[in-house]
Amino acid sequence: MEIKKATLYITEMKLIIPFAASYGTYEKRESIVIELEDTDGYIGFGEVVAFSEPWYTEETVKTALHVLQDFLLLDLLKAEISHPNEVPSLFKHIKRNRMAKAGIEGAVWDLYAKRQKQSLATLLGGNRSEIEVGVVIGINTIPTMLKQIEKYAEEGYERFKVKIKPEHDYELLKEIRKEFPNIPLMADANSAYTLADTEKLKRLDEFRLMMIEQPLADYDFLDHAQLQKKIETPICLDESIHSLEDARVAITLGSCRVVNIKPGRVGGLTESVQIHNYCMEHNIPVWCGGMVEMGISRAQNVALASLPNFTIPGDISASSRHWERDIISPEVMLEGGKVRVPQSIEREYEVDRGRLEEITKQRIIFER
């Protein structure tokens, strides 16, 4: 494959409901959509899932745009690629900037799937035609969060994740368990705690959580290992895992019992599959996280989550969870608590170009 043209779409969409985590609240989602066209006329789309502010990782929409324009796309347009798993090597001289890299790699995978006339799930090694999915409830008042859980349970979601922080944890989980004693429930702290909060976190064991996600800082492998020895609730690492090497370190040290895989955070689908395989070899279950993304990334997550070791319902909610109208057709839809996994290229999700144009603030074109 030789990429002859790359188009960047800087987009912005309003969320149906403002989303709040321990690090902040946002009402609109700014993103970058990448469209690649090869010399044979095949087209692929990817999505850069960085946020506008550096509160999840150091990357932002602006920094990703800089790296894409000034480095990554220049290298891509000079290269010849036989398979998408070659893309990470193409960019290995560029440090980190994994979300920008993942956006390009996602577009290459999409283009490659069309060339091969196979579904993305098939190419990645998926073995399921549908996946169970969960939903995330952002920080809000306890009554509001209880109502949201009730609403999403009625819609068929199989697993519920609530965002927590030190002043909004025990009482929240207590009320949830009072109202919903048997739902699969997990809590996401987004690094809001320190090891000094160990006793506070031990109290959460009584709520029979599936896991507590990223309680400590992203670099705290040693402290997570120490905390895991003192609490019964399984620790899941999210922000700590940027690569296969990070997963190896975490598992070797005993820093977690579950791993969250997000293609954007780890640099793309190729690294995601490698982390999945390593975790499966070491009996560590994985699940696919979400980034409040649009349909392009969401659809690629659906394909990834069809791999065999994704045994926990992921944060792959229906498009209608966040958007009045998504940028793909058909939209990702929930049916009986599950999302379908396209089994052929003819049934893949397609970009709605009209909707993409509506939300585009700026377009930048690069040619070979």
Predicted regions and their residues:
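Metal-dependent enolase-superfamily TIM-barrel catalytic cores that perform enediolate-based chemistry
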Residues: 122-231
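Structured beta-strand/loop patches that form or line metal/cofactor-binding pockets in enzymes
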Residues: 1-44, 49-55, 323-325
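A cross-domain feature marking catalytic cores of carbohydrate-active enzymes
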Residues: 48, 135-137, 162-164, 187-191, ...
